[in-house]
């Protein structure tokens, strides 16, 4: 491929450019790192998406930021590595395959573990490349030769090694603890996989009779309020606040537990909220996390009354055994009422923990699980003996070894680690890293790297029978926590580990600081003695344009690929209404979609989408995504494309001043730079400084804004117009200088914008760089590997900046006068000017062209100006008096202006009437009131201008 194989197309067509450059970059290996010891190292980890998932807006936003940082570092000359990978995503992937089997009338239990796992592997191979193809569509400059999968042999080896070492160090153990249990999936789940959903429920008030009469208070019973009467079968106490005078004398007494025949004690604990319900709370340690903690403090027994599929256990009292939890609830409430123990039932709003995957209500359940000890001191022989892994991870941030951006996340991170519980790492699934533990017939456990090693350990312990493998698998987050070092070849010593650990920065949403970020710090510090990364850039979450969370059930999700390629309405509707958890939501979603996208979504291209994400990337805040902004940045790409076409048309085949003379050689020399040339170069230095500051501070919104404003507002809207004048009217030396400036500034802009909009900049650079003397022109070079622009502050020219500022003010004043006098843009009229004579004469050609004037006459004194331009509309800009010499019918113009002033006055009266109406202000939506306030302000400004024009008319 050569850069000059065809001229630049007339219009910007992102699909063709993306299809060309994505594969080309990969073929050229631009993302593959060097290992040059003389260069700085830059590494970044891609948060591994689910292998069977698809790209969502959060991924696309996150990858835009990461790619921007990576391309920037590469262009600064660093040894650069962006490590890609996919996660086996235990629960998510298993659910997908189970649903496929369910549609065929088969369950995983029908197949058995081995055949089911084969099915999952087959599904992974079939669909696992979807998300990596989509990541490529975003233009991510990833070294795909290093792509890992968290269950590949190398990664599995690292996982096993970590588990075995932690167990040998006494930091992994098996025990019975309370966990989040999904009864549909039949497994423990992490907090991240649990949604708290506000629901309508009930608060049942139940009598618990006192065993002994209350002689002091005259009470016969205590009334307990609960939202879960079915769990009372597992109550082991009732508790009151120790300072609650109503019940203090009953502490240590007993009550009858209704429907069971058991007696349970009255205990005191400060956990009780005296204001909630009656101030008496039931304690069920086996089925409530808070009660579990109370039970630990008071050494209470634990009675499990639910099976793993959420049915009442076989040894439960009464006829409740075997009933579903909700059926048992109804039966228990009915029996309580029949026995006169139900005081009242009140409607109550409650937060129900529901499984993110199945929607089932989560049960706190006592089960045997594997845990990593968070607070236990590490033994001798580790990097930090005597200190817990949580303590070491906490110190990494507190000491400044790891920097969180923005800093306000430090307190959140610190608070979580300071109050951390042991980490439940086992899951009752079939897909995942099977825990490397084996049991003999007596239940003795042998943790080992292989079955052979386990048998050797068993034999050494005197156990000679067959061993049974632990069926549980590891939490997906366990293997994810190792990727900073496992993806670089650990436990082997590799060049990658030497160069790229710690990585430079981690880019992540705030929602997984605890689940992933903190655990990576723990594991990496414990096993390598190093932090996993120097900086964590914490960004907000992508929401819809109204700030609502994007979810399929709300019908407000957007597929990044649909924004890149476009999608018609029918396909979009089908996509949004298929596979809903609640199919009844489909009509609502269809209506919302038709309103928002009546003609579907147009193709914006990857660059416009990336620019939109960058512009929204404020520190720490959520991102309200609006497709209207995509349209604006697609327009920006068009503007940049058309500007490049203009530059090429005015430079190809011309002497563009790329000879040996780089500096201004004067009017009679080879190059003679105009004020405008020096101004745009000066301004470019300031923009380069702003962009570099933006990268240093992770302010991609500022980077996007600086580039946008410079390209659109300065280079395109002003400099290109000024350059036209200079090329048409300047000397040969001036023309060469202007052509050189056009090319050099544009080429620099393309390098500057490349980390944000890589496709269009690469395509344009291939055409511009050879003319600018920055490339050979044979197509072998890539913009991705060019030097990133850095400011040369010596090139800042404040005099040129002031000169152009004065020019802009004069041109704007002329344009405003034309608008106020309703002069057609096609009508060329003369400008009479007096003031800074030297400036006005030097700038006259530019003023004439940009303000669409027939001529610019400069007068030496104001008296002559007024005499020559009597009755003409006047503007004063700085020290310059400007008159547009036009003939107008003064009487007719006076009538027209008077009528318009009267009309605008009427509109102002209507607006003021509305805004003074208290009922309107109170009842109308805030947006409507704000709109009316803005209308009033606009009308008042228009009125002031009209009155000013009327006063200017000659008598």
UniProtKB/Swiss-Prot annotation:
Q: Does the keyword Coiled coil apply?
A: yes
Q: Where in the cell is it found?
A: Cytoplasm
Any GO BP annotation: valyl-tRNA aminoacylation
Enzyme class label? ligase
Motif segment ('KMSKS' region) = 549-553
Q: Name one GO molecular function term.
A: valine-tRNA ligase activity
List positions binding ATP.
Answer: 552
Entries under InterPro entries matching the protein: aa-tRNA-synth_I_CS (IPR001412), aa-tRNA-synth_Ia (IPR002300), Anticodon_Ia_Val (IPR033705), M/V/L/I-tRNA-synth_anticd-bd (IPR013155), Rossmann-like_a/b/a_fold (IPR014729), tRNA-bd_arm (IPR010978), tRNAsynth_Ia_anticodon-bd (IPR009080), Val-tRNA_synth_C_sf (IPR037118)
Q: Name one GO cellular component term.
A: cytosol
Sequence motif 'HIGH' region, residues: 49-59
Q: Which residues form a coiled coil?
A: 926-955
Q: Which family does it belong to?
A: Belongs to the class-I aminoacyl-tRNA synthetase family. ValS type 1 subfamily.
Describe the task this protein carries out: Catalyzes the attachment of valine to tRNA(Val). As ValRS can inadvertently accommodate and process structurally similar amino acids such as threonine, to avoid such errors, it has a 'posttransfer' editing activity that hydrolyzes mischarged Thr-tRNA(Val) in a tRNA-dependent manner.
Q: What is the name attached to this protein's record?
A: Valine--tRNA ligase
Source organism of the structure: Cupriavidus pinatubonensis (strain JMP 134 / LMG 1197) (Cupriavidus necator (strain JMP 134))
**Gene field:** valS
């Amino acid at each position: 491929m050569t850069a000059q194989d065809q001229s630049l197309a007339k219009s910007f067509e992102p699909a063709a450019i993306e299809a060309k450059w994505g594969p080309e970059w990969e073929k050229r290996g631009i993302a593959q790192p060097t290992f040059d010891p003389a260069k700085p190292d830059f590494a970044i980890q891609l948060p591994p998406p689910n292998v069977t998932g698809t790209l969502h807006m959060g991924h696309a936003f996150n990858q835009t930021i990461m790619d921007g940082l990576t391309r920037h570092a590469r262009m600064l000359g660093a040894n650069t590595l962006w490590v890609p990978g996919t996660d086996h995503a235990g629960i998510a992937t298993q659910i997908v395959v189970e649903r496929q089997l369910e549609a065929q009338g088969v369950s995983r239990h029908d197949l058995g573990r081995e055949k089911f796992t084969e099915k999952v592997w087959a599904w992974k191979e079939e669909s696992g490349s979807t998300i990596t193809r989509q990541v490529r569509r975003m233009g991510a400059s990833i070294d795909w030769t290093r792509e890992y999968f968290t269950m590949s042999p190398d990664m599995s080896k690292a996982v096993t090694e970590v588990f075995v070492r932690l167990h040998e160090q006494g930091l992994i153990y098996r025990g019975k603890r309370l966990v989040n249990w999904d009864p549909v999936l039949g497994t423990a789940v992490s907090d991240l996989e649990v949604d708290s959903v506000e629901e309508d429920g009930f608060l049942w008030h139940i009598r618990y009779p006192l065993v002994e009469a209350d002689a002091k208070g005259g009470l016969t019973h205590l009334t307990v309020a609960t939202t879960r009467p079915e769990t009372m079968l597992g109550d082991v106490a009732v508790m009151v606040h120790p300072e609650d005078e109503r019940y203090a004398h009953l502490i240590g007494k007993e009550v009858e537990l209704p429907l069971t025949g058991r007696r349970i004690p009255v205990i005191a604990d400060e956990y009780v909220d005296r204001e909630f319900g009656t101030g008496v709370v039931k304690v069920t340690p086996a089925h409530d996390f808070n009660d579990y903690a109370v039970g630990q403090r008071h050494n209470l027994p634990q009675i499990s009354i639910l099976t793993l599929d959420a049915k009442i256990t076989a040894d439960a009292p009464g006829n409740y055994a075997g009933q579903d939890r909700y059926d048992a609830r109804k039966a228990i409430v009915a029996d309580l009422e029949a026995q006169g123990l139900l005081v009242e039932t009140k409607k109550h709003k409650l937060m129900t923990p529901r499984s993110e995957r199945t929607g089932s209500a989560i049960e706190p359940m006592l089960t045997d699980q594997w845990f990593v000890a968070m607070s236990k001191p590490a033994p001798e022989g580790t990097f930090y003996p005597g200190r817990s892994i949580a303590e070491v991870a906490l110190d990494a941030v507190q000491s400044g070894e790891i920097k969180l951006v923005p800093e306000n996340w430090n307190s959140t991170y610190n608070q979580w680690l300071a109050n951390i519980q042991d980490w439940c790492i086992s899951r009752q699934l079939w897909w995942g890293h099977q825990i490397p533990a084996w049991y003999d017939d007596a239940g003795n456990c042998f943790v080992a790297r292989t079955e052979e090693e386990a048998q050797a350990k068993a034999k050494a312990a005197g156990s000679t029978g067959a061993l049974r493998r632990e069926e549980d698998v590891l939490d997906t987050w366990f293997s994810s926590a190792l990727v900073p070092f496992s993806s670089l070849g650990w436990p082997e010593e590799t060049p990658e580990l030497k160069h790229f650990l710690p990585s430079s920065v981690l880019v992540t949403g705030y929602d997984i600081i605890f689940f992933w970020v903190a655990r990576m710090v723990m594991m990496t510090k414990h096993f390598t003695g190093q932090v996993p990364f120097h900086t964590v850039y914490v960004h907000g979450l992508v929401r819809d344009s109204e700030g609502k969370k994007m979810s399929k059930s709300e019908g407000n999700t957007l597929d990044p690929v649909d924004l890149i390629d476009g999608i018609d309405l029918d396909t979009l509707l089908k996509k949004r209404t298929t596979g809903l958890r609640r199919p009844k939501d489909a009509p609502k979603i269809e209506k919302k979609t038709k309103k928002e996208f009546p003609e579907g979504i147009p193709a914006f291209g990857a660059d416009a989408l990336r620019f939109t994400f960058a512009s929204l990337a404020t520190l720490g805040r959520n991102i309200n995504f609006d497709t209207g902004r995509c349209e604006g940045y697609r327009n920006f790409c068009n503007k940049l494309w058309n500007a490049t076409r203009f530059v090429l048309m005015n430079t190809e085949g011309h002497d563009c001043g790329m000879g040996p003379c780089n500096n201004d050689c004067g009017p009679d020399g080879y190059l003679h730079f105009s004020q405008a040339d020096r101004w745009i170069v000066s301004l470019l230095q300031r923009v380069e400084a702003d962009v570099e500051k933006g990268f240093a501070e992770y302010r991609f919104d500022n980077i996007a804004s600086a580039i946008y404003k410079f390209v659109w507002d300065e280079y395109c809207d002003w400099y290109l117009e000024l350059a036209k004048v200079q090329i048409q009217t300047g000397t040969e030396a001036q023309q060469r200088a202007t052509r050189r400036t056009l090319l050099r500034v544009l080429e620099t802009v393309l390098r500057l914008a490349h980390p944000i909009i890589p496709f269009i900049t690469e395509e344009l650079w291939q055409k511009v760089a050879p003319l600018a003397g920055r490339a050979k022109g044979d197509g072998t070079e890539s913009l991705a590997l060019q030097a990133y622009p850095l400011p040369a502050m010596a090139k800042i020219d404040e005099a040129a900046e002031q000169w152009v500022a004065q020019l802009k003010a004069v041109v704007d004043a002329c344009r405003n006068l034309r608008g106020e006098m309703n002069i057609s843009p096609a009508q060329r009229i003369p400008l009479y000017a007096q003031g800074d004579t030297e400036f006005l004469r030097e700038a006259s050609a530019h003023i004439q062209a940009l303000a669409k004037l027939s001529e610019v006459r400069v007068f030496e004194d104001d008296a002559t100006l007024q005499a020559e331009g009597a009755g003409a509309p006047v503007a004063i800009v700085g020290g310059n008096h400007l008159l547009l010499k036009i003939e107008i019918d003064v009487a007719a113009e006076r009538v027209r202006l008077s009528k318009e002033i009267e009309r605008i006055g009427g509109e102002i009266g209507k607006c003021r009437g509305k805004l003074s109406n208290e009922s309107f202000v109170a009842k109308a939506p805030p947006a409507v009131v704000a709109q009316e306030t803005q209308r009033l302000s606009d009308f008042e400004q228009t009125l002031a201008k009209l009155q000013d024009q009327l006063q200017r008319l000659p008598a």
